[in-house]
Curated annotation (Swiss-Prot):
Residues 1-16 have a biased composition (Basic residues). Coiled coil: none annotated. The lineage of its organism: Eukaryota, Fungi, Dikarya, Ascomycota, Taphrinomycotina. GO terms for cellular component: cytoplasm; cytosol; nucleolus; nucleus; transcription export complex 2. The keyword Metal-binding does not apply. Residues 1-33 are annotated as: Disordered. Its main location: cytoplasm. One of its GO terms (biological process) is poly(A)+ mRNA export from nucleus. Keywords: Cytoplasm, Nucleus. InterPro entries: PCI_dom, SAC3/GANP/THP3, SAC3/GANP/THP3_conserved. This is SAC3 family protein 2. Residues 17-26 have a biased composition (Basic and acidic residues). The keyword Nucleus applies.
Length: 458
């Protein structure tokens, strides 16, 4: 075959250049991103940063007692170097763009969270925002961003930026009222997200819980901050509220009583703390199914049985449905209500004989504080309980000693909208930025248990 024929065949099978503008734009953006020619401003900042690193390292002594405490010097919500770096990486979030020019704006950009990585050098004062700027950043995220966008839209952005705020407080070892203020608002954000986004695709409830409860995370840090404030004889207005959340997030932990021993007396006198401790005691049960399955999240529901407990589920649901429990408390209780309902059904099973009539569906709704018929139907199906119908309406539930109850492995499999009954008519931004004790605001008269619960007659 001649050379000319081969060249013609190559040209024939050669793909034609794409006329799609989007493709050309993507290629141009990719070329700009991986170009070796950096922006002049970024180059200047990079050189300045290198000099700052050398100066900072020279000041640090090998003796930790003489080492200087890191104090942030960044006066904006986002450090200048990070902003220029993210511009080159095309990592600017749409919320950080100027609405007119569509360019990154220094007053709209917020520092993103970065994991500490080897080879990046020490954290510099210019990378860290002081407490006053961190407080302004939190106000911007919760009072502006969450007021402008829905929680579903803004959750990922706010979650990432608040992690960066906590990181800046941590590297400065800041134990101040500004730190308390910021951590309290961040805690409310995660608590509300647990409930509001529970059924949103790609939302991880487990990750949200870890941000609240794991060692060195939000509620743990708040506990340390409160303890430090007590040593300084300073008062924290919302301490009782968040101590109550600590208890409610640990309903499945039998060691909560030990953690409360260090709390001051005035905290125990607050109604919100009394209510949370009462709910904790009533939530304990002794009919857990002992299992070694790794699929069960023990951070939510303990598999340990509590000795000498009376399985007082009716009292638990009466208190939980009352005005004594606020919306945010209800958001946390939603995590445990499915497990407590499982314990209630197992306890009721032992009390009723097959010779008796079946439990009326409406009565069981009141006993288990189900917010709708569909919720109770789903609960019964998840536990393998048979429901009797009159026409299309559920009339009774078959539950007696002969009934076999299937205990769901994951409580998240059961839909629970317990907190919806307590949700106030206000937006998420207002709920997060309460100016007074959350235990006394946003109470809604309960629809359930207006009358004494009907107990099945034998």
């Amino acid at each position: 075959m001649s050379t000319k024929v081969k060249q013609k065949q190559k040209q024939k099978h050669r793909p034609k250049p794409s006329l799609d503008r989007s493709d050309s734009t993507k290629r141009a953006a990719r070329a700009a991103r991986f170009s070796t020619t950096l922006d002049a401003n970024f180059q200047a900042l990079k050189k300045k940063r290198k000099d700052e690193q050398e100066s900072f390292q020279a000041k640090q002594s090998t003796n930790w007692e003489k080492s200087s405490v890191l104090v942030g010097t960044c006066r904006q919500m986002c450090p200048e170097f990070e902003l220029e770096e993210r511009k080159l990486q095309h990592a600017i979030h749409p919320y950080e763009l100027d609405p007119v020019s569509k360019q990154a704006h220094p007053s709209l950009a917020v520092k993103a969270y970065h994991r500490p990585a080897a080879g990046k050098g020490p954290i510099l004062p210019s990378d860290v925002r002081p407490p006053s700027i961190l407080k302004n950043t939190i106000d911007y995220l919760f009072k502006v961003i969450l007021d402008r966008y829905s929680l579903r839209e803004a959750h990922a952005f706010v979650r990432d930026r608040t992690r960066a705020v906590r990181q800046d407080f941590s590297v400065q070892s800041s134990f101040s009222q500004d730190s308390v203020y910021c951590h309290e608002l961040i805690a409310r954000f995660h608590i509300i997200s647990l409930h509001e986004l529970a059924h949103t695709p790609n939302f991880s409830r487990q990750q949200e819980i870890e941000q609240l409860s794991k060692s060195m995370e939000i509620l743990y840090t708040l506990g340390q901050l409160y303890d430090y404030m007590h040593l300084r004889k300073e008062h924290c207005t919302h301490e009782a509220e968040f101590r109550a959340y600590m208890v409610l997030l640990s309903l499945g932990d039998p060691s909560v009583g030990l953690d409360t021993l260090s709390w001051p007396d005035f905290v125990f006198k607050k109604p919100i703390v009394k209510t949370s401790l009462k709910l904790y005691s009533l939530a304990q049960r002794n009919n857990h199914t002992i299992t070694t399955s790794n699929s069960i999240s023990l951070s939510l529901v303990s598999s340990f049985n509590t000795e000498a407990t009376s399985n007082l589920y009716t009292r638990f649901f009466k208190i939980a449905s009352s005005f004594r429990v606020s919306y945010l408390m209800g958001c946390l209780l939603d995590l445990f209500v499915p497990s407590i309902r499982t314990g209630a059904l197992k306890a009721m099973k032992k009390c009723y004989l097959s010779a008796h009539s079946n439990i009326p569906f409406k009565d069981l709704m009141k006993i288990l504080a189900a917010t709708s018929e569909d919720e109770l139907v789903q609960c019964c199906k998840m536990h393998g309980l048979k429901i009797e119908y009159i026409g299309e309406q559920p009339s009774a539930v078959v539950l007696n000693r002969k009934t076999v109850i299937t205990e769901p492995l994951l409580s998240s499999e059961i839909s629970c909208r317990f907190a919806d009954e307590k949700k106030p008519g206000t937006n998420v931004s207002d709920l997060i930025c309460l100016d007074t004790d959350g235990s006394s605001l946003h109470r809604k008269k309960p629809k359930l248990f207006k009358k004494r619960s009907i107990v099945r007659q034998r």
